[in-house]
């Protein structure tokens, strides 16, 4: 049953029999902006949501792993690519879908990439080749815009922001 438990201020799912509280918390999405020379790795999604659109390799964290372990795992799963993490790069709060998106800068250990089970295509792109109109998620688009601005400026500061729900037309 959905109710406010004693000592809490928000409605929670509470078992009427044992009174156990089932907390529903935001999901963590982790991924990499993975670079080889002047190109970055993008994956064309083979699953919903946003089937057929491009994104960086990223996905939900698994229990028992760190954020950077999850980002490395997702890059391997989605693009059969091995990376070395450079630094934490961006964190985006996406409250309307209860997600927190964490991206790392990473170096590809070699340029050999190929699609994983959930990916239609994995490819390295120069900035001018990126299919900007076919990027799957606002968080990824924001991170890539910052990334290329930062590259031109010669420094990669940490970025943080909130992705608001798109307005209905």
Task: Describe the residue ranges of each PLM region.
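Acidic, metal-coordinating catalytic segment for phosphate/diphosphate chemistry
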Residues: 1-32
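Short connector loops at helix/strand junctions that flank enzyme active sites
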Residues: 10, 25-29, 35-37, 49-51, ...
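Conserved hydrophobic/aromatic beta-strand scaffold that supports enzyme active sites
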Residues: 12-14, 33, 42, 103-105, ...
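Active-site donor-binding loop signature of nucleotide-sugar glycosyltransferases
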Residues: 17, 45, 58, 106, ...
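Conserved Nudix-box catalytic region and its N-terminal flanking loop in Nudix hydrolases
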Residues: 35-77
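Unchanged
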Residues: 61-146, 150, 154-156, 167-169
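Short, highly charged C-terminal tails/helix-capping segments
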Residues: 160-166
